[in-house]
Amino acid sequence: MLDIRIKRVYDPTDPQDGLRVLVDRLWPRGFTREKLGTDMWLKEITPKNELRNWYHHNLARRKEYTQRYFAKLDSNPVAVQLLIKYAQKGRVTLLYATRDIEHNHASDLREYLLSKFGKVDREVSSP
């Protein structure tokens, strides 16, 4: 069973976060590696700039954006398998910087991983 959570980079770190993986294409402004408390940065698993720019948080494009992002993930099995490997060993927290806590690529990535590789408790972020 996979335990994958999501959390904004601005939320406090917690020992219960497990492995903290930054899943943003750009490093968050104003953060050092120590301040962010990340264990890994997987920018290759994030949506490409072209897709991000096309979507630009236009919710009317959300469904197509998600389909295109999932297709990109299907074509990147190495990065996906790396996350799965770690999630099989313990909790993984996907870190993202966007302000939108409901519609973001980290929640899409979590949904993709769980739909392909296993279900977990529906809680999205750490308490």
Located regions from the model:
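Residues lining hydrophobic/aromatic ligand-binding pockets adjacent to catalytic sites
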Residues: 1-127
